[in-house]
Amino acid sequence: MKFIDEAKIEVAAGKGGNGATSFRREKFVPRGGPDGGDGGKGGSVWAEADENTNTLVEYRFVKRYQAKNGEKGHGSDRYGAGADDIVLKMPVGTLIRDLDTDEIVADLTYHGQRVCLAKGGKGGLGHIHFKSSVNRAPKQSTPGEEGETRSLQLELKVLADVGLLGMPNAGKSTLITAVSAARPKIANYPFTTLHPNLGVVRIDENHSFVMADIPGLIEGAAEGAGLGHRFLKHLSRTGLLLHVVDLAPFDEAVDPAEEALAIINELRKYDEELYGKPRWLVLNKLDMLDEEEAQERTVTFLEAVGWDYPKPDDRFQFDMETPRLFQISALTHQGTQELVHQINQYLTEKKRLEAEKAEAEKAAANVEIIEQQPKTDTGVFKPE
């Protein structure tokens, strides 16, 4: 199935049914009073996150979604039937934005999450509601309310813990294949990866994380060159970036350091927030070099890019803020287990710190609420 990560649609909820104007007419009841019922509600349009849906391709071909109107009210005080709602299945990670107001309507972040996109109109009142002591035979009823109509932008941003970035043919797809069950297309030509691939990296029964591989970047990507610029947004939800570098390019004229600096420059031009994310350096394709040459190229590369952080052989206790460097061969799996182990440690600690921060903020908010409560001279809260 073709991977589509953007679409524009229009959703229209149904109109409420009109209230009825009707009088009771039965044998032996010649002057029956009003008995017109209310109209039914119009159908609403909902979005639902579905983990089994992974593209917005359906919304490229069907642009308008219209719910049905509610049924009008009936005599004998019978209400009109309400119209059924429409539920639009969308991939987890879909961001929905109102095109008219630029307001974010919803961010679908978990399976089963439901959000109302357009609310159906209420049914009109039947004239039974207008009967009074001075007006025993009212003839007015109210029409149903109009349903909401919205023009929406759908934008899919895949949900992953770790994102891979690098030049085409840096070995990103080979890496995600080596550490997960993902099987992206791999070949010896640029832009083999044409859309994001996700792989679940399982550490044990209780620990796993999701890795995202996007098409390779080239110089000028921030201005639209190549394929990767369209998919950089898919890295915005990640907690960690792995910058994969081909340390042994087939073309001897290619300088890995220049390519790495070009990637960093494109990242900065595209989005400062994305540029500021934690980013580790992964030097790949060591299987193409002997040990001495690999060491020489690593030293030359680190000097050229101005790497001022610990080297793999340094005895150093990594903290959450320090970028890390790894030397691997995704093809032979050399060094990949250590990489996966450290990623898991980092993500586990990151989640723990975020949970502690959220708990502290919640406690501080509760204290502030208590302090704002009015008190008597004795310090006892005044009853509301």
UniProtKB/Swiss-Prot annotation:
Where does the source fall among the domains of life? Bacteria
- Note the subunit structure: Monomer.
Q: Does the keyword ATP-binding apply?
A: no
Query: Could you say which protein family the record assigns here?
Result: Belongs to the TRAFAC class OBG-HflX-like GTPase superfamily. OBG GTPase family.
Q: What class of enzyme is it?
A: hydrolase
Q: Which GO terms describe its biological process?
A: ribosome biogenesis
Predominant cellular place of this UniProt entry's protein: cytoplasm
| Pfam families recorded | GTP1_OBG (PF01018), MMR_HSR1 (PF01926)
Name the GO cellular-component terms. cytoplasm
Annotated region (Disordered), positions in chain: 20-46
Q: Where in the cell is it found?
A: Cytoplasm
Q: Which UniProt keywords apply?
A: Cytoplasm, GTP-binding, Hydrolase, Magnesium, Metal-binding, Nucleotide-binding
Q: Name one GO molecular function term.
A: magnesium ion binding
All copies of domain Obg, residue ranges: 1-159
Give the protein's recorded name.
Answer: GTPase Obg
Question: What is the species of this protein?
Answer: Neisseria meningitidis serogroup C (strain 053442)
- The OBG-type G domain covers 160-348
Q: Where does Mg(2+) bind?
A: S173, T193
Q: Where along this sequence does the record place binding of GTP?
A: 166-173, 191-195, 213-216, 284-287, 329-331
Q: What does this protein do?
A: An essential GTPase which binds GTP, GDP and possibly (p)ppGpp with moderate affinity, with high nucleotide exchange rates and a fairly low GTP hydrolysis rate. Plays a role in control of the cell cycle, stress response, ribosome biogenesis and in those bacteria that undergo differentiation, in morphogenesis control.
What are the leading ranks of the lineage? Bacteria, Pseudomonadati, Pseudomonadota, Betaproteobacteria, Neisseriales
